[in-house]
């Protein structure tokens, strides 16, 4: 037979349930940020999921009653998560670009190195002063071509140095013609970086694309000018943003809007 509990212990009410039983207002509890789970997983999907959960928490009707310390902590975590998402997406995009243009860069680097050897050999054999001046220019062009194939910015679309041209009977003229053809504007930037110092070329290679730089500049300017709008921004499952006005639409208006929009785009902040 089990031992019966005394009536005093049965009648005791837990303090957390006392307000509910007596009819008082229920006290809301806010869960602490689950940083350990995100850090342990480390995947982009986990970071996006955590960011969406924070956005939903901050955009709920009762978010104004949230303690200031909890809200500040969530907003700080949200900023850190956005930075991690942008960094991981940029890293993924970088790897894609490197793999995409790896072979063409490799072959053009080898070709430029062969042209350097060829022009140096021609320069050693040349006796005409005008020819020597022209060959020195060709040698400089070939040396810049080598660095062009190596240090062309990873995040930008690679432009070939030696596109397919008509074959000539004179192989020497064909090789020199490759060095005297028109060059891409980035070629001039690489030439200037070679004169600036050893750190200039790696910086040019790892620079952000013009599109990404413009996007980050706009987002920073928006966060500085309207910080309250950035914290209240909502992200849906596909990464799209919607402000508070769209979140307050009636179900009928939302259904009409979905019918007009049709299929949503798969591109977004959290994809």
UniProtKB/Swiss-Prot annotation:
Residues 69-128 form a coiled coil. Residues 257-271 have a biased composition (Acidic residues). Keywords: Coiled coil, Nucleus, rRNA processing. Residues 8-20, 217-246 have a biased composition (Basic and acidic residues). GO terms for cellular component: nucleolus; preribosome, small subunit precursor. It is found in: Nucleus, Nucleolus. GO terms for biological process: maturation of SSU-rRNA from tricistronic rRNA transcript (SSU-rRNA, 5.8S rRNA, LSU-rRNA). InterPro entries: Efg1, EFG1_rRNA-proc. Residues 1-44, 196-271 are annotated as: Disordered. Belongs to the EFG1 family. Involved in rRNA processing. This is rRNA-processing protein EFG1. It comes from Pyricularia oryzae (strain 70-15 / ATCC MYA-4617 / FGSC 8958) (Rice blast fungus). The gene is EFG1.
